[in-house]
Amino acid sequence: MTIDAQKYDKIARTVFAPVFPLIADQIIAYTGVTQGTCLDIGCGGGYLGAALADKTDLFVRFFDASPDMLEITRRTIAENELTERADTLQGNVTAIPLPDASVDLAVSRGSIFFWEDLPRALTDIHRVLTPDGWAYIGGGFGSKAITESIVSEMKKRNQGSDEFRDRVRRNLGPESRERFETALKTAGLDRASILHDEEIGLWIIIRK
């Protein structure tokens, strides 16, 4: 699926702005990972990775299939003065161009819903995790209140259409959870679980 990088980024930088620091806090609280290498998969403009870098000592590797998105990410890196603590990497999540056991924390928000071969992607994410590594991958907006606020704003921007609300419900609903559970079983990832509620959204947790 082709995404208009500039259009997507405009929304991410404005409407979605409150989401990233809150999710970063939730990731840190759940995993306890604050040092080492973080891989932000399907990073878009890099806002989740930047929020994690701001709150930790992590080196963040921003990973996306889109060169246009990575151009935006490089701007985010510069704006947040992260040039010594970050880099960018282009590629596909089913064949991450990194060595085995090289990532302490893999994160991804929103990208997973575009992954066509989910079991293969999860398998490769597991491959790059260090022996004590974590992956925190899925979708959400940090809280129910923020979700409702964003849905309302997007409805205004879409001339009253509920298309965005419907997509959120679909992505964070039971069908997506079932798809995630099936993919984890297919991938044979025993040390994995799913977090799912209306506050935090829908997330896959993987331990090495």
Indicate where each model-derived feature is located:
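Conserved class I S-adenosyl-L-methionine
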Residues: 1-34, 47-51, 163, 198-200
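Class I SAM-dependent methyltransferase SAM/SAH-binding core
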Residues: 37-95
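A short acidic, Gly/Pro-enriched loop at the edge of an enzyme's catalytic core
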Residues: 94-105
